[in-house]
Structures are given as C-alpha cells and as structure tokens.
Amino acid sequence: MNDKKELKLILVAARNQLSSGDIKSLIAYLESNDCEFEISLQISEPTEQPELLELHRLVAIPALIKISPAPKQIFAGSNIFSQFQKWLPRWTQEGLTKNLGINLQPSKIDSIRTQKEFLLEDELLVLRQENETLTKRIESQERLLRMVAHELRTPLTAATLAIQSQKLGQIDISKLQEVIKRRLEEIELLSQDLLEVGTTKWEALFNPQKIDLGNISAEVILELEKFWRLRNIEIDTDIPSDLPSVFADQRRMRQVLLNLIENAIKFSEDSGSIKITMIHKTNQWVEITICDKGAGIPLSEQKRIFLDRVRLPQTSEGTSGFGIGLSVCRRIVQVHGGRIWVVSELSEGSCFHFTVPVWQGQNKEQQYLTKG
C-alpha cells in the first residue's frame, strides 16, 4: 500500500524554456520521484492554456505552481529548481507533523520574505526582457542609420565627379544636369528611408522587380570610369547575352555592384585588371563574380569582413577599407534570399561572389525576399 501523499505541481513554461538547465534539472528530479510524496506534474504551455496566467496571477514564466498540499505556492525566476529543493523538506516536515496532530506553518517572516523574493525576481525578469528588446531595437536602428548614411555617399560622389568632368569639358551642361537630377532623386529616396528607420523594418524598404543586371553593371562601370582609367586598370566583363533577368530591388543591386567594383579598384595595383562575370547558375539563381588581382585577404579575415565595423586589410595605396560597405552588401544579398562570399589568396587577389534570384514572373505581393 502506498502511503505517500500527493504533491500536485503545474509547470507553466514555453517550449524553448523547457530546455534550460534549471528546468531540465527540475523535471529530471521530479521524474525520479525521490521524495516522500507521490508527485503529479502537469506541464502547460501558456499559449495553449492562457487562462493559467490569469488564474494563478502569473507575471512571468517559467513558473512552478504547487497546488497541493495546501497552501498554494508559486516559484518563478531563473532558479526554480533550487527554490523547490529549499521548500521540499519543509513540506515533508509539515506532512509528518500533521500526521502527529501538530500544526507547523511557515513563520510570518518567512512567508513575507518569500513573497518579496518572488516579486523581485518577477520584476527583474520583466526588466531584463524589456531591456533586451530595447537593446535589439536600438542596435537595429543604429545599423540602419549606418547603412543609409553609407548609401548617401554614392550619389554625392557621383554628382561631384560629374561636376569635375563638366569643368574639364568631358561632358556638356545638359549631361551634367541629367546626372545631378538623377542623383538628387536618389538622395530623396534615401531621405525617405531615414525617416522610416524608426518605424519600418529594413526589409520593407525593398522594392523587388524584374531587372537586368548586365545593364546595371555597365552603368556602374561607366560611373567609376574616372577611378579605373586614372590608374590604368582594365575591366573585363563576361556577361552572356541571354542572361535571364533577376527579381531584385534595382537600387540595392546597383549599390552592391558599386561597392564591390569600387573595392576591386581600390585594392588593385596600378595597371592591374578586374573581371566581372555573371552566369545563370541554376534555374533559380544568377551568380555574379567580381575578381581583382590585388594583395588578397588573409584567411582569418575572410568571414569577418562581412560583419559590421570591420576594417579590411591595407590597400595597395596604403589606406585601409572600412567594412560597412561589405556589411551592407551582405544584408542586401541575404534579404533577397541569396548569399555572398569571398575566395582569396594572399598576393593572388580576391573574387567576391553573390547570388540573386532569377525573375520567374514574381510580383511584389509574393514573399520571395527573406530577412537578412
């Protein structure tokens, strides 16, 4: 005959919380049933039984509720198992003394202290969660601001170069006006992005459509002509005439190509060469490769250069590149569902590769873009 009294418990926790060390230890201990009680454990997820939160006035999870023997007690916080272990001997003692006709209740001081501990732990947990949410939001907004600020450099540089070219007689005034007008339109779009940084996810600022990457790369090469001609750098392109269109944001793709080609020029030796290749890799992807014959990137740096605020190795001109550009490229490519990587050897040069989805009749309503 089993004389053990029932210890009825309810564990309220989300699925991901069940794998934490504290909760796993608690469940393992309860399953071993190595105590003076017959343990009955019910595990409930708050999304499936939200009424439990209101019924037991829970302000934070995970939480362990002792239903019986009375009185009801609630344990919450990050150390539920240790709290349970501290109280279990007391419940056992209470059961024994009741069998002997002795009424042994926790002291009023103990009860007040325990209640205050629970309240403080609940408040701390809520504050930690709020702090984590705010920190992530601030980091996201800072990242967006850095990216948009970096994008502003492109139209400003292009406008400056156009003014210089007009002064040298390389373009006429009507061509200059056309360039300035186009760049001001780009700056206006970027200004709108800045205004939406606090209220909009970066992914929502993308406008995917059917675009021709070959034409965009030709425009970028022409825009950077002054830089590569000045250093006698040769740019060779291998873009098939039947290359399919891609489904992407035209302005963002132009930014990726501009960043990567500009970096290739910066890191190339004078009289060097750069090759731009585009191939229809599979039915779903176009792969773009931009290779230079510069100093190369150390293996230890090849993954880090795509992170925020990472400086690139020194260029051939003795200046160091800043990693915001490559970080922006990574996020743009990833938002389109593609990937970006580098293959590089010291003294041999670097090849940057990235993939973009092929246009297959998609429209803006279709969720082809993913979070970066």
UniProtKB/Swiss-Prot annotation:
**EC number in record:** 2.7.13.3
Top-rank EC class of the record's enzyme: transferase
Q: Does the keyword Coiled coil apply?
A: no
Q: Where is the Histidine kinase domain?
A: 147-360
Q: Which domain of life is it from?
A: Bacteria
Q: Which InterPro entries match?
A: HATPase_C_sf (IPR036890), His_kinase_dom (IPR005467), HisK_dim/P_dom (IPR003661), HisK_dim/P_sf (IPR036097), KaiB_domain (IPR011649), Kinase_SasA (IPR023527), Light-responsive_reg (IPR052545), Sig_transdc_His_kin-like_C (IPR004358)
Which PROSITE patterns has this protein been placed in? HIS_KIN
Q: Which reaction does it catalyse?
A: ATP + protein L-histidine = ADP + protein N-phospho-L-histidine
A Gene Ontology molecular function term of the record: protein kinase activator activity
Per UniProt, which keywords does this protein have? ATP-binding, Biological rhythms, Kinase, Nucleotide-binding, Phosphoprotein, Transferase, Two-component regulatory system
Q: Which residues carry this modification: Phosphohistidine?
A: 150
Alphabetical GO biological process terms: circadian rhythm; osmosensory signaling via phosphorelay pathway
What is this protein for, i.e. what is its function?
Answer: Member of the two-component regulatory system SasA/RpaA involved in genome-wide circadian gene expression. One of several clock output pathways. Participates in the Kai clock protein complex, the main circadian regulator in cyanobacteria, via its interaction with KaiC. KaiC enhances the autophosphorylation activity of SasA, which then transfers its phosphate group to RpaA to activate it. In addition to its output function, recruits fold-shifted KaiB (KaiB(fs)) to KaiC to cooperatively form the KaiB(6):KaiC(6) complex (independent of SasA kinase activity).
| Domain comment in the entry | The N-terminus interacts with KaiC, while the C-terminal histidine kinase domain autophosphorylates and is probably responsible for self-oligomerization. The N-terminal domain stimulates the C-terminus to autophosphorylate.
Which proteins does it associate with, and in what oligomeric form? Homooligomerizes. Interacts with KaiC. Participates in the KaiBC complex, whose core is composed of a KaiC homohexamer and 6 KaiB.
The protein's name is Adaptive-response sensory kinase SasA
Q: Which organism is it from?
A: Prochlorococcus marinus (strain MIT 9215)
Task: Provide the organism lineage as a comma list.
Answer: Bacteria, Bacillati, Cyanobacteriota, Cyanophyceae, Synechococcales
